[in-house]
């Protein structure tokens, strides 16, 4: 094989290593020589460009090996099959917590009624777990090979991945050696790490939270000072020498000692027990209200909202930095692809002095890139518009701005009818006024259901006469079926199905029709006094309930018809789709606190004698207590119950009941756990989520944040995605910065 010749003009400021002998597969040259290895080098350049563009699309680092075999492995690793396998493995190892001891496989979490759960035999879940750990070990090995040992040593996430795997395998071995009777499983606490390390956005979010902690801590310190000062004021105020009944009740109930006083005011800070804590003193003297009002105004209205503002400002700033890194990765990936492809221009003597990318070469690359068909087609059309003109670096970068647009689905053309009557009918039933009529009919159906629910509120299901409601439902369902068929006639089947609202509407109409036919087949036609005996699995009342619930659900079809409501609904859907990273962080936090809660409080909530039924045995329990409110299902006896308990605590309504119960059942130290959970979930995470909801809505309603229609087209074909909230604020990386970073690539040498 002929040795490739190094050019005198290096692409990125000078040849690295002082020579032209580059390792095979790592060198890209301005002139591709003709010879036995020319085809292989050509394929290598194409594959390198494909990988770099895919890295840019996914905001991945390009500092990986770029020889032929490594790129083959790299593309297989990031293929849909491998990534879905890895995601399923992460889901599986997290899901094991529901099956492992203590198992959540019971119908209820209430300690009074819960039967002994099925416990898996030793080795069953452990076998699944070790398979998952082996998949993670393979994942780590592939990452370590592709990015190299030097990168592995500097990457804390990869080092943490290795430590977590080693600790998990050691702990797994200990479990088997103790026949699954170990008192503590450390590896269960470490499992959420696998979810974190697999998401770059979760890593960025976690880093931003860590950077924002000092500012959060400063406001938290103010809150602590505020709480301590008013605790001392309260203890002094309600511990006077001449106490009236109100003072004494207040002191004994809420300010008996320092821990109780702190807890009472902390709960009041969350407004969970307002005005309960104030009532004993306020009932005797209205002047005592001043103390509680001032405390609430300063703490809840000023400091807590100040904390929200600081979290919004600081976190948004740090998120900008992380997103700036993502933007730089995209620009660096596309620039690397440009440099690789521009090195192929001189093949065969064409454009010997030109610098740019041949459109036909880029088209060949785009054919191999893993990209959705809509974006790929749009980009290829733009590339073809250049003809044989070389693409400059700037034009190459602008081409990939198409990735920042979401495709608006174009509806198929309507069927063409020759008959004037059919054309008029098509115009009538395809008009949006016909949708308004359908919405009015759906509203009338909903009102009829509401009327009968009100009239029959005090009537037992077995004594209800469903004749009139049954007739009305039959009429409405026939109209829904007729409406669906007329829309199919006007729009065509493909045109009808191209509207998501029609798919939703049509699917529910078919389900309603099947359910109504089943009801009529089993219980015959409605008639006065229509109360037949139960036949089959469901009674007439059960089938009517299902029918009415589907009709109520179908009423959601009005949302697309109301512009403002449609904007709000689309923004909410965008949040669901684009806030997965924050949902993942919440899953991690819930998982860790649930496992800790199980280890701390499993079995501490025990039903007292006389509380095994719903008989009024709780009459002796204090009003508002855990026992009187029958909160027995809120416990940490298994993973599912722990998750629900943590959710109820995050809402902070009546969370003082949990604090008091676990203090009595397990000890006063339990308050530390619940206060930490309140800080992490209700203060930090909820405020972060609120900040991002605000940013999302502001972006959605800002007309400047959307792309204008393309020139020469009647309407915009694309629009900005909700995912790119901050793109207009981010700073584009400079030319020198990109070339400098490319010159530092550990596995790629580019020469001209």
UniProtKB/Swiss-Prot annotation:
UniProt main location, coarse: membrane
GO biological process, one term: monoatomic ion transmembrane transport
Gene3D superfamilies listed in its UniProt record: 1.10.287.70, Voltage-gated potassium channels. Chain C
Compartments in which it is found: Late endosome membrane; Lysosome membrane; Melanosome membrane
Region named Interaction with phosphatidylinositol 3,5-bisphosphate: 203-207
Keyword Repeat found: yes
Alphabetical list of Pfam families matching this protein: Ion_trans
Family the UniProt entry places it in: Belongs to the calcium channel alpha-1 subunit (TC 1.A.1.11) family. Two pore calcium channel subfamily.
Subunit relationships: Homodimer. Interacts with LRRK2. Interacts with HAX1. Interacts with MTOR; the interaction is required for TPCN2 ATP sensitivity. Found in a complex with LSM12, TPCN1 and TPCN2. Interacts with LSM12.
Protein name: Two pore channel protein 2
Organism: Homo sapiens (Human)
């Amino acid at each position: 094989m002929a040795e490739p010749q190094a050019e005198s003009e290096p692409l990125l400021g000078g040849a690295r290593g002082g020579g032209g002998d580059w390792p095979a597969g790592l060198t890209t040259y301005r002139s591709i020589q003709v010879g036995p290895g020319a085809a292989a080098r050509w394929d290598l350049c194409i594959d390198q460009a494909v990988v770099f563009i895919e890295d840019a699309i996914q905001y991945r680092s390009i500092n990986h090996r770029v020889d032929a075999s490594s790129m083959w492995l790299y593309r297989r690793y990031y293929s849909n099959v491998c990534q879905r396998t890895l995601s399923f493995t992460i889901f599986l190892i997290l899901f094991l917590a529901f099956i492992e001891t203590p198992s959540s496989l019971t119908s209820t979490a209430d300690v009074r009624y819960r039967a002994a759960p099925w416990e898996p035999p030793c080795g069953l879940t452990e076998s699944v777990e070790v398979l998952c750990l082996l998949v993670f070990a393979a994942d780590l090995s592939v990452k370590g090979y592709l990015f190299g040992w030097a990168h592995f040593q500097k990457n804390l996430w990869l080092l943490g991945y290795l430590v977590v795997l080693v600790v998990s395998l050691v702990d797994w071995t200990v479990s088997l050696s103790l026949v699954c009777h170990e008192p503590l499983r450390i590896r269960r606490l470490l499992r959420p790490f696998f979810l974190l390390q697999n998401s770059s956005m979760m890593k960025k979010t976690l880093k931003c939270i860590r950077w924002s902690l000092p500012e959060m801590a400063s406001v938290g310190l103010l809150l602590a000072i505020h709480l301590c000062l008013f605790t001392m004021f309260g203890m002094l105020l309600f511990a006077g020498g001449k106490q009236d009944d109100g003072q004494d009740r207040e002191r004994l109930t809420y300010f008996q000692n320092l821990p109780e006083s702190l807890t009472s005011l902390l709960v009041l800070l969350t407004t969970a027990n307002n005005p309960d804590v104030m009532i004993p003193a306020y009932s005797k003297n209205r002047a005592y209200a001043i103390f509680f009002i001032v405390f609430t105004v300063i703490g809840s209205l000023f400091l807590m909202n100040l904390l929200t503002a600081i979290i919004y400002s600081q976190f948004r700033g740090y998120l900008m930095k992380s997103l700036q890194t993502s933007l730089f990765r995209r620009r660096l990936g596309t620039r690397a692809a440009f440099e690789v492809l521009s090195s192929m221009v001189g093949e065969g003597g064409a454009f010997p002095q030109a610098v740019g990318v041949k459109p036909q070469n880029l088209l060949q690359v785009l054919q191999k890139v893993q990209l959705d068909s809509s974006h790929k087609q749009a980009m290829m059309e733009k590339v073809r518009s250049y003809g044989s003109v070389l693409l400059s670096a700037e034009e190459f970068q602008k081409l990939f701005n198409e990735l920042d647009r979401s495709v608006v689905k174009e509806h198929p053309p309507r069927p063409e009818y020759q008959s004037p009557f059919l054309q008029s009918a098509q115009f009538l039933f395809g008009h949006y006024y016909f949708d308004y009529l359908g919405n009015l009919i759906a509203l009338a159906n909903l009102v009829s259901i509401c009327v009968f629910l009100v009239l029959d509120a005090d009537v037992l299901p077995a004594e209800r006469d469903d004749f009139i409601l049954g007739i009305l439902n039959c009429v409405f369902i026939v109209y829904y079926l007729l409406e669906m068929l007329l829309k199919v006639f006007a729009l065509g089947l493909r045109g009808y199905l191209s509207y998501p609202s029609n798919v939703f509407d049509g699917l529910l109409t078919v389900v309603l029709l099947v359910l109504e036919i089943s009801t009529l087949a089993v219980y015959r036609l409605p008639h006065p006094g229509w109360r037949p005996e139960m036949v089959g699995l469901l009674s007439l009342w059960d089938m009517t309930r299902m029918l009415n619930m589907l009709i109520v659900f179908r009423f959601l079809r009005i949302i697309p018809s109301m512009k403002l409501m449609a904007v709000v609904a689309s923004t909410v859907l965008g949040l669901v789709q684009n806030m997965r990273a924050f949902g993942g962080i919440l899953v991690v936090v819930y998982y860790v606190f649930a496992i800790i809660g199980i280890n701390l409080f499993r079995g501490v909530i025990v039903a007292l004698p006389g509380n095994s039924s719903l008989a009024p045995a709780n009459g002796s329990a204090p009003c508002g207590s855990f026992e009187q409110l029958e909160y027995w299902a809120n416990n940490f006896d298994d993973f599912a119950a722990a998750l629900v308990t943590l959710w109820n605590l995050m809402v902070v309504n009546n969370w003082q009941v949990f604090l008091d119960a676990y203090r009595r059942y397990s000890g006063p130290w339990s308050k530390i756990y619940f206060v930490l959970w309140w800080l992490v979930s209700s203060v930090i995470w909820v405020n972060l989520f609120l900040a991002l909801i605000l940013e999302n809505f502001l972006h959605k309603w800002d007309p400047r944040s959307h792309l204008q229609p393309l020139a020469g087209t009647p309407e915009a074909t694309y629009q900005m995605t909700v995912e790119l909230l901050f793109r207009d604020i981010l700073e584009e990386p400079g030319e020198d910065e990109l070339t400098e970073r490319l010159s530092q690539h550990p596995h790629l040498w580019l020469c001209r």
